[in-house]
Amino acid sequence: MDRYAVIGQPVAHSKSPYIHNEYARQTAQAMRYEAIEVGVDALVPTLKRLHDEGYLGVNITLPHKVAVAALCETISERAALAGAVNTLIRTDTGWRGDNTDGEGLVRDITQNLHLTIAGKRVLVLGAGGAARGLLKPLLDEKPASLTLTNRNPWKPEELAAQFKAHGAIQPCTHLAIKGDQFDLIIHATSAGHSGSMPRIADHILAPGAICYDLSYGKAFEIFAAWARAQGATRIADGLGMLVEQAAAAFRIWRGVEPDTAAVIAALHKTVSNVEAAETSVHDSNAKKRTAAEHTAAAHSIAAED
C-alpha cells in the first residue's frame, strides 16, 4: 500500500488525514495517509527517513513550510514565488517541492462559490506567508485590480515588486483603504486566532461582494462578524481552500480527481458539531461557576449575619 503523510508541529489537529483518506476511498486508491509530529530539530532526518521508507508524498504544515523549501532538490515556480512548500513529491534521489495553497483558494472561489475572479477588484488583507502563496494564482486569474494591505507598508511594497512580472499589485496599509470598493476581500492575517481584526475602513464592499477568510472555526468568526456588519451576504471560511489544496496535491500524487464538495460538506458539519459541543461545555461550566458563586455569596452573607 502506498504511503503518504503530513508533518508539522503541532499536527494532531490536522484534518489532512481525514481528507486524503476520504479521497482514497472515493477513488479506490490503495494508499494510506497519516499525521506525523515533527519538531524543527527532527525535520531533516525525518524527511530522509520518509524517503528511505518509500513514502511517495508528504504534505508540510506549520512551522516547516519555509524550511522545507530549502531542502528540496527542485521546487515549482509557484513554490519558489511563495517562498514556501506545502507538498512534496518523491523523486529517485529526494523530494520535489510544490505549493498548492493558491490553487486551492482559486478553485474554492471559482468552482464552489461560483465567483469569476477575472475582471474583479480583489483585496488581500495581510502580506505574510499565507498571502504570499496566493498572489500568483490570483494574478493568473486576471483580476481588474489586486490590492495588498498590511499594517506596515514595506511588506506589500516588497511583494508588489517581487510579483511585478506576473501582474500589478497595489500595495498600501490597512488604514489607507478609503473610498475604494472590492468584489472579493480575502482575509489572510492570523488576527482571528487572537480574537482581533485588522483595522480597515468601512464601506469597502461592492454589491454582491464575497468576504473570504483563510481561517475556519472560531478564528473565522471575528472576520465574519465584521463582514456581516458591513452588509455582506456572501461570507466564506477557509475549509473549502483546505479541501481544495489537498485535492491539488492528491491530483499530483495519484492523477485522479476527488469529489471535494462531499468532503467540504462533511467537514463543515464536523466543525459545526465541535463548536456546538464546545459551546455546550462552556455554557455548562459557566452555569457551574455561577452556581458556585451564588453558593459562596450565600455562605458569605450567612457568615456576616
Where in this protein do the model-derived segments appear?
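Phosphate-coordination loops involved in phosphoryl transfer and adenosine-cofactor binding
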Residues: 1, 118-121, 207-208
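Phosphate/diphosphate ligand-binding glycine-rich loop within oxidoreductases
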Residues: 1-113, 218
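Glycine-rich adenosine-cofactor-binding loop
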Residues: 8, 99-102, 109, 113, ...
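Adenosine-phosphate binding glycine-rich loop
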Residues: 119, 214-281, 285, 302-305
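Conserved S-adenosyl-L-methionine
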Residues: 140-145, 230-233
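NAD(P)-binding Rossmann-fold cofactor-contacting core
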Residues: 143-163
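Rossmann-like adenosine-cofactor binding region
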Residues: 166-235
